[in-house]
Amino acid sequence: MKKLSRKTVWLLLAVLVFTVGSGFSARRSAALPAVGETVSGFRVDRVERLDTPGGKAAYLTHEATGAALVYIEDTGAAPALTIAGRTTDGLRRVTLTADSAGELLRGAKESLGALFGAETEAVPDADAAYRAFLGCLFPGCDAAGNGAGEASAENMLAVVCAPPDGAADILSWLDGVFSAADAGEALAPDAAYCRIEKPVKETVSIAGEGTGGVYFGIVCPRAGEWTRVRLAALAAALERTGSLLDKRVRAALPDTAAVCGTASAGTDAALWFFAPGLEEKDAETFRDAVLAALRAASETGFSAQAIETLSAAQRLEELTFPERDDLGAALCEGFAAAWAQGDASGYPAQLRERWSAAAYLADGSCAEAVREELLTSTLTALVTVAPGPLREPEPTPEAAPAPTEAPAPT
């Protein structure tokens, strides 16, 4: 038998690898068709590569109802699913995770099938205090609602993170969920939002323990994307231990920690601050400490050490983000949050900007935003959240005597 030359062997191996690789790729991408095609009632509008954590995101529309879908694949993350709905009383959202696409689908069928079909009773939860604050800062905004209203199909979003080979079954189920949902009028993001016209100072009571504290927020009207990027960078810098905010607050209110973040409603954005455990008598002192920290940032900027510390922390976060145990859920909820603001496809850019915050501190962009956007704004909300008593359960009619023996399971 004639022996093959070494060159021929290498050529055959190359062809084999190419063939297997191409077939594997084709099988993996076959679940989601090309842009403009449809699968299980969903039309593919756009597909983009994700720089971090890798993989792809496909943006689809349910042709029968207009519901939105984001399908994330090839990230290596554990399967996850988020379903969100915009209701007349704010946003409703739930996220499921699983070890496999099949398990995710089974869990979804058990717990999500009727989630948006009827009104849900509003109950106190961990976000109730924050929502109460947003109701004062951004009256009527979606994020201030509890999602108790009914969600129609036009106002729904599903975000799926799963292997492509599980896409067909999941999309088929979602097609049924959206098709069965009640028809209704499409709601624009923050349709009921009305901007405050003067400083607001309120005290609100929230049932339950651990909800007390003081919030202070500053609204930037008609904030463009560049303003929002700089506000996010400021929040990342100021919430760190040892920051200008941390020092000013602790000097004014010893043993008090403060956190900060950003929020938006309509065309407006805001930077907010929260100190848990403070009471109404501390509210103005907290507000003044926050403003003092902002004035210091506008005058002297941020130290080289603060910039270096933030840069190192964000670089580490960027490198480890693809290795997160909850990566699938984090991606799903990130896309859903961007959708709630008006555009799900904005999430990848938000991730990139989040990891660039230190650069905006170093070049003076954040100090400029403080001077031109925050310290000049008179639209503020100072809100004290006081823990209130839990509601007593409603009395129920006397129940009939229970049987002495439980019925056998069927």
Task: Label each residue range with its predicted role.
Residues 99, 107-119, 135-136, 150, ...:
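Structured segments of extracytoplasmic/periplasmic soluble domains
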Residues 19, 25-39, 156-164, 308-410:
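C-terminal regions of mature proteins
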Residues 205-206, 212, 253-270, 280-290:
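A glycine-rich, aromatic-flanked flexible loop/lid motif
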Residues 101-111, 126-133, 166, 170-174, ...:
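Stable alpha-helical elements in mature extracytoplasmic
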Residues 71-76, 91-100, 155-163, 220-224, ...:
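Second-shell loop/turn segments in exported
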Residues 4, 26-37, 83-154, 288, ...:
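Acidic/histidine-enriched segments that form metal/cofactor-coordinating
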